[in-house]
Amino acid sequence: SSLLTSVAVNGCAPYKAVLTHGFTMDGEGRKMSKSVGNVVAPQDIIDKYGADVMRLWISSVDYQGDVRLSDKIVKSMSDVYRKIRNTFRYLLGNLYDFDPKTDSVAYGDMEELDRWALLRLEQVKRTVLKAYEDYEFHVMYHAVHNFCTVDLSSIYLDILKDRLYTEKDDSLLRRSAQTAMYEILTSLVRLVAPVICFTAEEVWQALPNREEREWSVHMADMPAENDRYMDKVLEEKWKKRLALRSVVTKALEEARQAKVIGHPLDAEITIYADGEHLETLKAMEKELADFCLVSQAKISGDLSAAPENAFASEDGTVKVSIAVCTLEKCERCWERTPDVNSDPKHEHVCARCAKVLTEMGE
């Protein structure tokens, strides 16, 4: 009626844009009805799970069609919310001694892994900003969820743990990681603020260097795009590396389930590959063990030399054999290396950890 009235009186629509949406159905796709007893009240969800979980669910659905809502669906959404919240907690927890004014590392001096993380952040940032402009909130939801659970939790932060926990507090390696984490944190909290507004505000108030920022995340601008992070060469290189790591991760999980190993750091792996895969492996030979989260890693360019029980990629172009590493375990970093006990002042630790302990005056 408002459309007809406005057109008749003013000759134009009373709004710039209009969105259409479907109905909210129950978990089985049936129309909600009090007589049937399948009505899910939003206030009940908010009371049980919190407003941010409700808002996150709303952002996750494609509202242009009918959407389903049930306690089971919301419970699943609360698990997703918890993963996002835990990502924020982990980032904040590892920035306790980081001052962005004095400790930040220049982009060109950062570790390549950290620059890859910023590349992924930039891609997610652009996806989310466009999704908001297009009112496609479910695109924003999936981009953030995937970034937190896959790019950060399963890859970046998993590899980063060793650097964060074993390196000297003010080392370049650790500060490089913290610089990337700080950029990720301050960007991500603004990207999700329109949806999980209460959680975003909670994170904002806990940020390092908080006094120099807007008093509320909801008063801050969205993060600006940064073309420098969009490194196509780096993207292609890490696409190949992560594909290989995925094969190793599956092989390690299979070995763990078969009780061949207990923890990945108990493993010694040999990766068999040729052609382009072999070139990728050789380019990262020095950091391969750390990248795959194992104690020792070897490379073979002869696929036919792989043992029969070696784990093979789906296309058979990469094979991984896993054995228990018999080297002594460093009590500080848990890696099994040949240089454990090499420093008489620091027993039962590897040479790297002994060096760090010496630098720390211990």
Where do the model's predicted regions map?
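Metal-dependent nuclease catalytic cores in nucleic-acid-processing enzymes
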Residues: S1-G11, K250, A255
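Short alpha-helical scaffolding segments that buttress acidic/His motifs in well-ordered protein cores
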Residues: S2, V18, V53-S60, R85-L91, ...
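Catalytic adenosine-cofactor/nucleotide-binding cores of aminoacyl-tRNA synthetases and other
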Residues: F23-E28, M32-M110, P208-R213, A258-H263, ...
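Core structural elements
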Residues: D79-L92, E112-V124, H142-L164
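Acidic, turn-prone loop/beta-hairpin segments
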Residues: F98-R126, L157-A251, A255-G275, E279, ...
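Short cysteine-rich clusters marking metal-coordination/redox-active sites
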Residues: C330, C350-C353
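Cys/His-rich metal-chelating microdomains
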Residues: R336-D339, V356
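Short linker/helix segments within small regulatory modules
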Residues: D339-H348
